[in-house]
Each structure stands twice: as C-alpha cells, then as structure tokens.
Amino acid sequence: MERAILCALAIGAVLGGLDLLIGNRFKLGERFEEGFKLLGPTALSMAGILCLAPLLSGALESTLAPLWRALGLDPAMLGGILAIDMGGYQTAELLAQDAAIGRYAGILVAATLGCTVTFTIPLGAGMLRGLDAAGFYRGLLIGLGTLPVALLLGGAVSGIALLPLLIQTLPVALFSLLLMLGLKFFAAQSIRAFSAFAALLRWLSIIGLTAGAVQYIAGVALIPNLAPIEEAMKTVSGIGIVMLGSLPAAEVLRRVLSRPLMRLGQKLGMTDASLAALLVGFVSITPVLAMMKEMDLRGQTMNAAFAVCAASALAAHLGFTLSAAPQMILPLLLTKLFGGVLAAVLAVLLTKEKDAGEHASRAD
C-alpha cells in the first residue's frame, strides 16, 4: 500500500512538471511550483526547532520523563504535544524506550494532537471572531473527542499490540478531555495559553535557526549540543520534494471529488464552501480558516472537527513522514482520514438543521 501511495505522488509530480512545461494549461503546474515555494516558510517554522530537538528532549528527560516511567508510560508520548514538523517526532524518538511507541507518538500523535495544540488552535483564534469562532470551537470539541479512536486505529495498523497501545494512548485521551473542558468552560484563558505556547515555539525556532546558521557558517557553537542545521534542512527539503507530487495529486483528487461533494452538500442543505473546504483542509488548514466566513454554522463545525485529525495530511505531514519514517505512511493516512471523516460525520449529526445554510457571519 505504501508503494502505491508513493507511485501516486510520483505521478502527481510528473503531471505537475509536464503541465508547467506547457504553460500551466491545466493549473497543475502552479501546484507543482508551490511545493518549492513553500520551502522557505517551512524551513523558517521548523528548522530551528529541529536543531533544538536534542535540548528539548534533554529538558524533558530530566523533568517529566521519570514520572512517565514511574507510571509505566513511554516518555516518547511527551513529544506528541509538539507538531510533527515542529520537533514532535525528533523529541519522541530521542525519549523513546520502545522505537514503535516513539514512531507512534512522533508521527501519529504529533500530526494530530500536536498540530492542533501548536498550530490549528492559535491560528484559528487569531483569524476568527464572533459566531465564526463559536462554530470553530464547537468543531474542535468534536474532533478532540474522536481523536483517541483514530489514534488506536493508526497504532494498531503500525503493529503495536492492543494492551500497550491502550496504555500509551490513555494520557492522550485524558489530555484531549482536558482540552475539551478548557475550550468549553474557559475558552478565553485556554486560547491565551495555546497562543502563548505557539509564540514560544516560534521564538525557539528562530533562536535555533540563528544558532544553527552561525555554527554552520563560522563553526562557533552558540548553543551546546545543537543538532546540525544541515540535517534539519535535509528534512525540510524532503518535505518540499514530496509536495512537488502531493500538491498536484491533491488538486486532481479535489477535482474528481468536487461534484459528488457538492451534491452531498445540497442534500444536507450546506453551502458549497463548507464541502469544498474539506478537500482543501486535507492539504492545508490555513485556507480553510480563511474560508470559514463563507460557511454556515454546520460547515464551520464540520471543518474544524475534520481538521483535528486530517489537517495537512497530503502536504507537510506526508512529506515529513516519508522523509523520517516511511513505514508510517499508511498508518498516518488512515489515522488522519478515518479520524477526520468520523469527526465530520459526528459534527453533521450533532448540529441542528437550522445551522445548515445559515451564514454564521451575518450575526457577527
């Protein structure tokens, strides 16, 4: 299955490259170009954190890791609080007692829970206001509720036995519950905490990038035990190469599925933007958040729920996984697709009919 996925990505790269050669006639060439254009922003956001990964894991090793071991848990799970491409994988790998649990935490947990905490929630809080934000937070509650189920599926597919998988996933379920309670009853305070955490990671990334550049250029170690910046850039480059194929392939998939999804949206009484955003979100969450002002309340809730697991599956997260742990490609995509669809279906079932087709922003 992994081979079939990689072949599909390679075909996407061929289609994008050929279209670029003939003048972007089918609009796939621009998606091909976008893969490389994203290298700069990707490097700026993650290379510095990757350089600092040994220090982050060392800090966790001397603080929380002993408690985790005393509870019978693998310290690798601590890395899952960071996004997969913001040090989550490297931290989990360095802390892991069991390599399989390290991959589970660093790929599956970090690509879902970690991405939600460090990126989706702070970004959404900054972009959305009023009823738009209300639909977004409602969807996050649903998505966080289904997250442990999706992780159990992905962990089982990756080869982890059921009992160890349940034990290691329990802290994730409890943390998801705490996030749900925080967003439900202390939304403003929770958002401030998430935003501060995301800002801290941005600061650390810039510091790590600066120190890594100085060490590479001048041979001066401003920060001891820093991972070489060229290793971080190798990971970033791998993501960019994969996106040369994944972005055109995702565009083809979007075109194939757009009409069936539009018909489904009409049956559910939802706006076109609400259904179209699901396919966009499988590539990147940022444009989905921008589109939420065009959605009805049901669409906002559904897309936010979908994003907890499914965000960026066919772009940065797939590229990172192919570079770091290619054997986890199938578990990653199954976790993201199953979790996203399950959350989206629940969001539709749990929202009222009057929320469909009603433009949330008009009351903002």
Each predicted region: which residue ranges?
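Short amphipathic alpha-helical coupling elements at transmembrane boundaries
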Residues: 30-38, 65-69, 231, 259-270
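Long, well-ordered mid-to-C-terminal structural blocks that present hydrophobic/aromatic surfaces
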Residues: 221-273, 280
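Juxtamembrane "helix exit" motif at the C-terminal ends of alpha-helical transmembrane segments
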Residues: 56-60, 215, 313-327, 333, ...
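Interfacial/capping segments of alpha-helical transmembrane domains
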Residues: 55-74
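Alpha-helical membrane segments and immediately flanking helix-loop junctions
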Residues: 71-146, 271-325
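Signature of multi-pass transmembrane helix bundles
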Residues: 1-48, 104-113, 118-245, 326-364
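Juxtamembrane/interfacial segments flanking transmembrane helices
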Residues: 23-28, 60, 253-260
